[in-house]
A protein has these predicted regions:
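Mid-domain alpha/beta scaffold segments of enzyme catalytic cores
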Residues: 1-268
Length: 268
């Protein structure tokens, strides 16, 4: 299932954001996870999008595959008009041993304006709960850059802005707040000027590598099912931008992941 032309990785890979619970993997999940582990992907964080089936499926994956860790949270797209956060359910799920973060949480104003208040309230409360549990957050920000930064500035969690799409100035502001910037396959796209500028400006010590699998496959694999081995393509592009070896990108990103998410992300 891995492309024959995919070059080998010079250093073990940590994918800090994926969705192997997604139905897109239903016909190939087990074989693919075995393949990518053999390729060199040694840690994966699966991010849930709700506190129900997605959370349970992510946790089940971690029980079957110990190299899979879990982030538990309510994604903004699953927030309902008039909805509230089931705090006790979130707290209960976060006690599971594979849970290393609260996520995927955040704001998404791309499709609708009718749930902005609910999204903000639930996002803010999840940041507060993450702080109470001493867990980092994994943040989704789509077309909501100002409000996302405001809530992070107010609640001051530690964490990562997943698939960062904001300006260089806001990326550097997040770095000043102690946050990490998540970069994946988008950086290989021909229209990725903003992401390239962010990668050039942000210190390597503030960058995490991710895929968002099964989404956002990098060039030259666009249109195919994304998987964690494809991180090598994002790492190569960052190495080119920063004029450093690919191995350095992978190594520093792995150290960053362990620093943020804890010992469970340390490479043996």
């Amino acid at each position: 299932m891995l492309p024959e032309d995919l070059e080998s990785t010079p250093f073990p890979i940590i994918d800090t954001h994926a969705h192997y619970d997604d139905a897109a993997f239903d016909g190939c999940r087990d074989e693919l996870l075995r393949q990518i582990y053999g390729y060199g992907v040694k840690k994966i964080i699966n991010a849930s999008v709700d506190l129900d089936s997605s959370a349970e499926n992510c946790l089940a994956l971690s029980r079957k595959y110990p190299f899979c860790l879990t982030a538990i949270g309510v994604h903004p797209e699953t927030v309902e008009a008039g909805g509230t956060l089931d705090e006790q359910r979130l707290l209960s799920l976060c006690r599971e041993p594979s849970v290393v973060a609260v996520g995927e949480i955040g704001l998404d104003y791309h499709y609708s304006d009718d749930k902005k208040a609910e999204q903000r309230d639930i996002f803010k409360r999840q940041c507060e709960i993450a702080n109470e549990l001493s867990l980092p957050v994994v943040i989704h920000d789509r077309d909501a850059h100002g409000d996302t930064l405001d809530i992070v500035s107010e609640t001051r969690p530690k964490g990562v802005i997943h698939c960062f799409s904001g300006s260089t100035e806001s990326a550097l502001e997040y770095c000043r707040l102690g946050m990490y910037i998540g970069i994946g396959g988008v950086i290989t796209f021909k229209n990725a000027r903003k992401t390239v500028e962010v990668a050039a400006a942000v210190p390597m010590e503030n960058i995490l590598l991710e895929t968002d699998a099964p989404y956002l496959s990098p060039v030259p694999y666009r249109g195919s099912l994304c998987n964690s081995a494809f991180i090598i393509k994002a790492a190569e592009r960052i190495a080119e931008i920063k004029c450093i070896p690919v191995e350095t990108v992978l190594k520093v990103a792995a150290l960053n992941a362990a620093r943020l998410f804890g010992n469970a992300l340390k490479l043996n």
